[in-house]
């Protein structure tokens, strides 16, 4: 460790301790399991693993009714929405297979332990803990490399503060350490690696790096198909007007290598669809309102991203401060497209969630402008006020995460008046709850 990089190093350690501590504290106890996280949407991402490795039943799922009866994982009784029955009589997943692939090492370790120590049914406590703590470890390992990357562009103090605010001060904290089986924590490191690969590829182009870029884009795509726009990051990195098309034409062979890496990963999803539905491509039924997006995802009283996680305003402001960075066009283009896609989804509430969860996995990209804003502020003459504000909003985010997990901050029915009433409160009274949105307003 370089002596002049100690602040960001200790910040990284603090973030890691906080992530693991929150995972331990927020066990989400249930009647059937001390920790139960492969539920609701997370069940749809995870199901591929026990179905493949334990039950050898990836399309009939005959084993699942007994599992559901034992653990109650699907969320809504009688609504197995995570998998759809197709015309050929087989089930196919609503959610893509990529997250399960990323979870696989931790699942296999859990299964090995369960064979000796517990119930090896794929859903018992050992598996829940394996996925829960595995997600935290997966993210923390990526943060080690992310810190090194950030230090190429920002000073040590800025990176140290940025790691604290970007991870513990936004909603990604919830999805790494509490809702760990959801897709967000598993995709987060892919954004870290695409940033690092984009930067190193443009410095020194090799076939291996080209393939790794394609593999990373492919992995993100088969986790959540909307993550496919991650490709604009390497494509527009170090963008130079007037030289764009010629630059890529000169590197067309390496682009083909990236394409091969992408297709290799994408083919896993295609072969699964062919096996389960008889079709190479299957429509899972998502609907979009691209011409009439839902800006309340960002500003709404229910769970607005910039309302409930106000430190994210630094990510927005920082976009105006990165003009001189080689990643400026790349990051700005990605953030605009990503936000537009997220707010255009028809089911704009994204189920029960803290803030706008569909933006959380791309936090590494948004931290680049965020750190630009932090660097500007901490070197201003108002630094005392700046540090006070940072401390306040960081504390608020952590407090609200505890509110959310204890049912005080509602998952999708908040109103301005209700939020005012429970602000910094550890509980909500019956009078407070009268100000939640009614079922008719959902």
Residue ranges and their predicted role:
Residues 115-122, 141-170, 189, 204-208, ...:
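Transmembrane-helix signature of polytopic, membrane-embedded enzymes
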Residues 49, 163-164, 208-224, 231-235, ...:
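Membrane-interface alpha helices of multi-pass inner-membrane proteins
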Residues 186-217, 234, 365-369:
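Specific aromatic-rich, kink-prone transmembrane helix
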Residues 1, 6-16, 157, 256-263, ...:
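Signature aromatic-anchored transmembrane alpha helix within multi-pass, membrane-resident enzymes
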């Amino acid at each position: 460790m370089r002596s002049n990089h100690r602040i960001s190093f200790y910040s990284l350690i603090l973030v890691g301790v906080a992530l693991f501590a929150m995972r331990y504290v927020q066990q989400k106890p249930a009647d059937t399991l001390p920790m139960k996280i492969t539920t609701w949407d997370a069940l749809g991402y995870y199901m591929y693993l026990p179905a493949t490795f334990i039950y050898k039943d990836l399309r009939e799922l005959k084993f699942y009714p007994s599992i559901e009866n034992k653990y109650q994982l699907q969320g809504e009784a009688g609504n197995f929405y995570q998998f759809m029955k197709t015309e050929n009589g087989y089930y196919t997943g609503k959610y893509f297979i990529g997250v399960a692939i990323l979870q696989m090492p931790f699942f296999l370790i859990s299964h090995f332990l369960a064979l000796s120590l517990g119930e090896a049914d794929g859903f018992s406590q050992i598996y829940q803990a394996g996925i829960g703590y595995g997600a935290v470890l997966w993210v923390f390992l990526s943060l080690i490399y992310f810190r090194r990357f950030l230090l190429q562009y920002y000073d040590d103090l800025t990176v140290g503060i940025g790691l604290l605010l970007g991870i513990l001060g936004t909603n990604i904290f919830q999805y790494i350490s509490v809702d760990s089986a959801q897709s967000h924590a598993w995709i987060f490191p892919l954004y870290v690696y695409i940033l690092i690969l984009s930067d190193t590829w443009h410095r020194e182009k090799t076939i291996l790096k080209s393939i790794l870029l394609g593999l990373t884009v492919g992995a993100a795509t088969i986790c959540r198909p909307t993550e496919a726009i991650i490709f604009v990051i390497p494509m527009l990195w170090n963008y130079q007007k007037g030289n764009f098309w010629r630059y890529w034409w000169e590197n067309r062979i390496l682009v083909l290598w990236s394409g091969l890496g992408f297709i290799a990963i994408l083919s896993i999803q295609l072969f699964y669809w062919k096996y389960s539905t008889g079709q190479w491509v299957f429509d899972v039924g998502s609907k979009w309102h691209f011409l009439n997006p839902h800006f309340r995802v960002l500003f709404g009283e229910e769970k607005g991203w910039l309302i409930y996680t106000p430190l994210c305003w630094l990510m927005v402001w920082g976009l105006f401060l990165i003009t001189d960075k080689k990643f400026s066009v790349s990051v700005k283009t990605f953030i605009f497209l990503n936000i537009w896609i997220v707010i255009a989804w028809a089911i704009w509430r994204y189920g029960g969630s803290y803030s706008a969860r569909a933006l959380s996995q791309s936090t590494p990209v948004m931290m680049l402008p965020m750190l630009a804003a932090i660097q500007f502020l901490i070197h201003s003459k108002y630094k005392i006020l700046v540090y006070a504000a940072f401390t306040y909003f960081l504390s608020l985010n952590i407090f609200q995460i505890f509110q959310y997990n204890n049912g005080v901050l509602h998952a999708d029915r908040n109103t301005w008046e209700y939020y005012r009433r429970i602000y910094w409160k550890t509980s909500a009274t019956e009078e407070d709850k009268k100000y939640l949105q009614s079922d008719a307003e959902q």
